[in-house]
Amino acid sequence: RCARVCAVLFLFIQISYGQYQVPQVTVQALKPRGFKASIPDSPSVSLFVFQGNINRAISKSDIGTISGEILKAKDGRWTFEDPNVELKVGDVVNYYVVVVSNRGGYIKDNLSFTVSALEDPSSTGTGTDPVPTPTTCRPTATKLRSGVACAGQTIFEENFNTFREDVWQIEQYIPVYSTEFPFVSYQHLSQDPTVAVTGGNLRITPKLQQRMPGFTDSSIYSGSLNIFSGCTAPAEACMKDAWGASILPPVVSGRITSKAFAFTYGTVFVKAKLPQGDWIYPEILLEPFLKKYGSTHYSSGVIKIASARGNRELTSGYTDYSNKMLFGGPVMNLQCYDTLLESKASSNGRQWGDDFHEYVLRWAPERITLSVDGVEWARVEPTASGLSGRFPQTCSKLPRTFLAAGTKMAPFDDHFYLTLGVAAGSITEFPDGVQTSGSRPKPWTNTGSKAMLHFWEDMDSWFATWNQPQLLVDYVKVVAL
């Protein structure tokens, strides 16, 4: 049964027994609406997860209709709050909780709470000071990891006047576990950085690994890459030895994430100038915080807010894949990668990377829409059976059982965080059979075991086109629905 919980909730946690006792859970039903569940703080605790159903049984493998995770204690307690839950006297909340203590996960299940009265929101039930609730706060479908969002409220805003390390994490790792498998390593460089703020813009710039200090051309196929110090991923993604066709990632790039800020549902505004250059592409994404539907094959989903391949010319027959084509939308299956993706051609003949544009994602409980410069260009809605109903049965490894336990928008019904970056190559972003300028074919195949090697061997051709490889971001803003 433990394996089922790990698969649904967090594949990276090993459930443990006998070392930590989950304390009593304090549960409150609030008026006119709202729900709270909390446990007292302990120095060893690093995560509190709540899963519950109203008037319906729940097992350890279920994702509840009341669901959330808390990463930080406040006022001596780990408190999960959902201001949109409506309960009445006599309702029964069946639930379980998971607590991570000293890197071990501990489950307390078969719990229930019967609503005997609705409490005032200012009452904490724990003796701590009341938490003020704005009197003008209108309800919203938007949920935060902690705290309450109000309709129309700006819940995140970044203008990149400086780089704020308390808001953004600069990633450093080799994406060995990435489903896209880009041909890069993400590095936090102190000299000639890949991530910088200049002139009021975030600037993320890809570079060649062989031109980094201590590296040469031969390093790519016979050297070692050790970025363990400062690495933001497990150890296997922090070091690599080149061996045969398994070369070092030939491109060094930058990636930042807002892991301190994650949310469910809202409108995201990004004003950006996309990178240009053969075989590079931007990463302007929402990525799943907990990966509760699975961690492989996009099982927990990714939303591409905006992307355009960097090639100024890129075609396959009569189909244009160049920088003139904007694409984006949700991804939730590797085999059927582009099922929900949409595309839009530039209307004035210019490339998307020639100018700044405002890209907008509206993520709601009923649909996902994309806009650019105030014009909606994509809309993705679930079927009666959910978003998974948009996929034929031939799309294997879609976690249909888990998705059916969520809402119709599953897996896009949980907390996601912001990601900004630049990548190159990959096995998903450039279809096989395309040709770039001068009818030059794509140098690798997506299923080939030597894909990265063949990409690097064609470096003289593609690197000459990297005249504007930077992703420039003017601002990012998230507004509650």
UniProtKB/Swiss-Prot annotation:
Residues 1-18 form the signal peptide. It holds the Pfam family Glyco_hydro_16. GO terms for molecular function: carbohydrate binding; hydrolase activity, hydrolyzing O-glycosyl compounds. Involved in the recognition of invading microorganisms. Binds specifically to beta-1,3-glucan and activates the phenoloxidase cascade. Glycans are attached at residue 110. It is found in: Secreted. GO terms for cellular component: extracellular region. InterPro entries: BGBP_N, BGBP_N_sf, ConA-like_dom_sf, GH16, GH16_GRP_C, Glycosyl_Hydrlase_16. Keywords: Glycoprotein, Immunity, Innate immunity, Secreted, Signal. GO terms for biological process: carbohydrate metabolic process; defense response to bacterium; innate immune response; regulation of innate immune response. Residues 20-120 form the CBM39 domain. Gene3D superfamilies: 2.60.120.200, Beta-1,3-glucan-recognition protein, N-terminal domain. It comes from Hyphantria cunea. It comes from the Eukaryota. Induction: By bacterial infection. Belongs to the insect beta-1,3-glucan binding protein family. This is Beta-1,3-glucan-binding protein. PROSITE patterns: CBM39 (PS51969), GH16_2 (PS51762).
